[in-house]
Amino acid sequence: MTVQMEYEKDVKVAALDGKKIAVIGYGSQGHAHAQNLRDSGRDVIIGVRPGKSFDKAKEDGFDTYTVAEATKLADVIMILAPDEIQQELYEAEIAPSLEAGNAVGFAHGFNIHFEFIKVPADVDVFMCAPKGPGHLVRRTYEEGFGVPALYAVYXDATGNAKNIXMDWCKGVGAARVGLLETTYKEETEEDLFGEQAVLCGGLTALIEAGFEVLTEAGYAPELAYFEVLHEMKLIVDLIYEGGFKKMRQSISNTAEYGDYVSGPRVITEQVKENMKAVLADIQNGKFANDFVNDYKAGRPKLTAYREQAANLEIEKVGAELRKAMPFVGKNDDDAFKIYN
């Protein structure tokens, strides 16, 4: 399947004109979507449960309501609460207030694709999924460009769902740099696979394994940390900027030769088969059900995984080394918090 990048000129209909927009949730993505849309001239209110997010939204100048109140007032409702709480939030506070002709949006297809949330047939369902964290969605918008986004339609009750999704993407700044049309199935499954097999799960497991190999062979933990973790950003930045080609042009011949010779010894066909098994568990819903069931049980598995990860030797070594590198970790930690 070949997809074509679309831009502001391709957003033909100002579908959000005259619409009351409710952003549900005011965390990482919520604050960015809401502020960008407001700055794009849209009529935005916030729906959120009492707490830090509620207070922050009011502080930022938004009319802020309970989730149920905001849903009743709005024509277009974007649900940007964490995936695991969306089902109960939708069933208790959003669904009873929906009306025919409303539009409901998401930034990730998880709950719609796996059918944890079922929206009435007379309501549009769309997606705007920026390919970056909320603080970058906001910052790049303020700088005059944006973060690329995927958009999709799951249900088109009014015949206007695609226009709403594209206009939403334009409003948050994504159409300045590029939009790609997708489906809920494709976005959800690819996004989860990327996170689990490569970007988060695969990467951290690779780094930890490399650290263990070096330290178990007698090398100093501090030096091992620099070799397998600290330098990762330098390499990833080069790949991000110009693909594998730019990275390989920027490293030594020794490193490049070692890349070709040893990379396939680490990432073998068996690793690829393991990746296929990860993808299968995503496609058949096993991962989604395990994740949701763990949340409903009080997160025992997630809590145990977090405790185990916090006690890794590489984390302890890294924490000490970063104290001596004041230029590392200067980002505002608050920008990365997600308030429920």
UniProtKB/Swiss-Prot annotation:
Q: Which GO terms describe its biological process?
A: isoleucine biosynthetic process; L-valine biosynthetic process
Q: Which Gene3D superfamilies match?
A: 6.10.240.10, NAD(P)-binding Rossmann-like Domain
Q: What is the lineage of its organism?
A: Bacteria, Bacillati, Bacillota, Bacilli, Lactobacillales
**Gene behind this protein:** ilvC
Please write the reaction equations for the catalytic activity of this protein: (2R)-2,3-dihydroxy-3-methylbutanoate + NADP(+) = (2S)-2-acetolactate + NADPH + H(+); (2R,3R)-2,3-dihydroxy-3-methylpentanoate + NADP(+) = (S)-2-ethyl-2-hydroxy-3-oxobutanoate + NADPH + H(+)
* Record: residues binding substrate: 252
> Member of which family?
Belongs to the ketol-acid reductoisomerase family.
Looking at its record, which EC class is this enzyme? oxidoreductase
Identify the GO cellular component terms for this protein. cytosol
Task: Name the cofactor(s).
Answer: Mg(2+)
- Cofactor remark: Binds 2 magnesium ions per subunit.
Q: Where is the active site?
A: 108
Where do the annotations place NADP(+) binding?
26-29, 49, 53, 83-86, 134
Keywords per UniProt: Amino-acid biosynthesis, Branched-chain amino acid biosynthesis, Magnesium, Metal-binding, NADP, Oxidoreductase
Q: Which residues bind Mg(2+) 2?
A: 191, 227, 231
Q: Which residues bind Mg(2+) 1?
A: 191, 195
The EC number(s) this enzyme carries: 1.1.1.86
Q: Which organism was this protein described from?
A: Streptococcus pneumoniae serotype 19F (strain G54)
- Identify this protein by name: Ketol-acid reductoisomerase (NADP(+))
Q: Name one Pfam family in it.
A: KARI_N
